[in-house]
Amino acid sequence: SQKQKEKKDLVILDGRPFEEYNKMSIPGSICVPNAEMPYKISTLVKTPKTEIIVNCAGRTRSIIGAQTLINFGVQNKVYALENGTQGWFLSNLNLDNNKTNYLEIEPNKNEIEKLRNKIINLLEENHIEIIDFLKVQDLINDDTRSTYIFNVKANFNSRNSIYGIRNVAGGQLVQATDNHVGVLKSRIIFFDEGDLVRAGTTALWLKKMNFECYVFKGKEKKLRSLNFNHHIKFKSKSVNLITFQDLK
């Protein structure tokens, strides 16, 4: 609030999904879901002198968003806003409601290429494999392991129409993993629009949570011919029953 009053050179990025941002937000902030931040930051911040402040509703997603930008080598000073919108409200500061400031601008081709090279290096350093369609099918065909596949591009206007694939924004997949992935240490395949940045960003965080992560090098349309028809091996044993009388 003080920095805004002093008209400092800064931007406030809200790393939550649009639905949460729309409900309540910090005045002057822009909705940029966490996994989109490294992909879109260059369209908004043009000078390294601009301070970047990341907020959420509390603290977790602001820390994840800020650290993601730092990991990508952003030269600006990056801060995570302590206690987020809740702390703002408890400090007797006014929140905005029903705002629609969503950063939809896409980076240019040259910037996307730079970002792609950066994420490829980060994935290699963290031993996360970038795979093609055949490898995706091989992983799905392996009925000895649970494999999930997600489109992590944040898009509040549409959802995936491919059977077996869910659209979950990368930031939310990191924030609420147990809502979407039911098997600990399972395999997870991530993809986006082919830039690899959003899928790679999400994979880097999930790898730290002991999931076996892969990034698909391609777009959604290439996955329409995936075959999800396989048998699940599950052997059940009969349950021994006991009556109330036997318990006496």
Name each model-derived stretch.
Residues 1-11, 15-148, 152-248:
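Rhodanese-like catalytic fold shared by cysteine-dependent sulfurtransferases
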